[in-house]
Amino acid sequence: IVQLESFINPNWITDIKLNKNPVSNLESLSNEFTSGLISVPVLGGGTANTEFEVITGMSAEFFGSGGFPYNTIASKKAIPSLAYTLRDLGYSSNSLHNHEGKFYSRDVVYQNLGFDSFTPIECMSTPERTPVGWAKDSVLIDEICNILISTDNSDLIFGISIQGHGGYPSDYIE
């Protein structure tokens, strides 16, 4: 599972004409492998709540308006999750995020969600950066590939990207 921060398929934007498909690789992978769309609980912030809902199947709304289960319950105790379920079926589970491990308490939370390992940016090779300073997703993809190469098990890999995070240009395309 790869969660792409702030991603939108540019082909869905009406009233623009593109010279070529900017997401042809993604569409090819989506056609070849299991993929789908998901409705997320947040807009303009709170990526961790989307992560929480995907991994646990629980709504973040159950934990109060404006709350972050990662910073409250999930940082304090084990929470039933996809990682625990798949562990019982013999899977190894790895979570990765190309941002700081302490942000949203991910360094603790992923252990409480049943992941065997969590790899934050601090444990990755030095990444290229976006113009606004976020780590590019190439470092995340490299780490995912390293995990896949190094294991013979069935794996649950949950990668959370940050490359698409704001700020965003405020000028308009003519």
Which residues are covered by each model-predicted region?
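Solvent-exposed soluble domains appended to multi-pass membrane proteins
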Residues: 1-4, 8-174
